[in-house]
């Protein structure tokens, strides 16, 4: 019997202001762990899978139950240690120390590959935490919507004079991360055709309003796209088809999309990508009997897809890798020019990272959407001169359905994170909000990740693979008083290709919380400015000087 599967489980986090734990500092991680497994949030909650192939919230159901049990008894001077989804120890620390410290999927570099990890996983000795799955701060597909939106807006500016109307994006994948592409694309003004092999995922995105229409043939999908482009009103279409088949067929037909990308779970060829010609059931059976054959077939199909992406690029499509490591998989399968199209971070996002700007997110532990709407208004009040940000918040309120506990994401940087957090804490203190707020972020942030094929691709000083930076980030956030801190390996791009850290902090309205959030939410984005300034980026150097960062090696 698989201890990770239990179809009888239906996890819903408590709402309201009544505590189940001894304080909000332990109630918050409990609720956020549970929220990760909410049926409207997780991809396969019965298997503890939150998103991203096999990204889990806990190692197995026994470990999940024990984590909840420990959090309910944990004192405010104790810290729970979680090793790859398993609660392994409780230690006396102090009130400003994290209540939970998490390490997921970390392997000594020589053994940091899928083959070794999968053996450990089968033996119950490891868990793939992805980024926010095992660090308990996943908020559903909204978590990546704004980053994807910002990328597509940048694509429109760079390639189409800022006008996306009448243009369309071809992509693959409608899972927890990929599902953001359709909504983000239409928000940016593009129509989007997204290929997905799992019909239940398309239906999930339809239900949560991330996809507008479903198609079962390429001709039907193209007709929907053409009609939308003719009308000037963008549409998103989920096409039930294999991305490799569709991308290659468009090359054959001589049809060139305006933008081409992909967000299938290509980072995990065993569990995340369906080979061409295979059914879902066939793949599930083969994963049990011949893992090597599945991996080989999946990577061969990825090679077909990437070759098609290269040909579409040559035909004029703006083509970008969206961080799932599909170029690497194709390169390993013989597509030697797989890296001829860029990753999205160096092409579009890095200037934001240089100022510590990244995916700041917060969640209303009350479960009351009004708490989020009040914080939206506070953000506008405190950042009055940013119409782009205001437009994002307006669109998010109108078009993004909350999944599980109400949440918001908004890309802000070093100048704003700490003061927003302190304002939220004050709102809790004076009763404007009905319960505390938790603030976190994706591990995809400016100072918290080393990932040479994604966030740190093509660093100007060649330091792409240096992973001291996320380790320093985790250490500093721990020292600064975050509520829980995590250190992971392999998120986004798979085993051996990334190391990254996460941070979450509670705004419970106390003076102690005000001091903690002031430290954590200044220091955390400041490490991103530090990292990019150290690599030589002038934007980061200027930001560091303007904000008074003490960087000893930064020349005047």
UniProtKB/Swiss-Prot annotation:
Q: Name one GO molecular function term.
A: urocanate hydratase activity
Instruction: Output the GO biological process annotations, alphabetical, semicolon-separated.
Output: L-histidine catabolic process to glutamate and formamide; L-histidine catabolic process to glutamate and formate
Catalyzed chemical reaction(s): 4-imidazolone-5-propanoate = trans-urocanate + H2O
Q: Which cofactor does it need?
A: NAD(+)
- Do you know which InterPro entries this protein is assigned to? Urocanase, Urocanase-like, Urocanase_C, Urocanase_central_sf, Urocanase_CS, Urocanase_N, Urocanase_Rossmann-like, Urocanase_sf
Q: What is its EC number?
A: 4.2.1.49
Its predominant location is cytoplasm
Query: What GO cellular component entries does it have?
Result: cytoplasm
Record: active site: 410
Top-level taxon of origin:
Bacteria
Q: Please name the PROSITE patterns in this protein's record.
A: UROCANASE
Record key words, sorted:
Cytoplasm, Histidine metabolism, Lyase, NAD
Give the UniProt subcellular location, in the record's own words. Answer: Cytoplasm
Q: What is the free-text note on the cofactor?
A: Binds 1 NAD(+) per subunit.
Residues reported in the UniProt entry to bind NAD(+) = 52-53, 130, 176-178, 196, 201, 242-243, 263-267, 273-274, 322, 492
- This protein's record includes keyword Transcription regulation: no
| Pfam (any one) | Urocanase_N
Q: Which family does it belong to?
A: Belongs to the urocanase family.
HAMAP family reported for this sequence? HutU (MF_00577)
Say what the protein does: Catalyzes the conversion of urocanate to 4-imidazolone-5-propionate.
Spell out the protein name for this chain.
Answer: Urocanate hydratase
Q: Which gene encodes it?
A: hutU
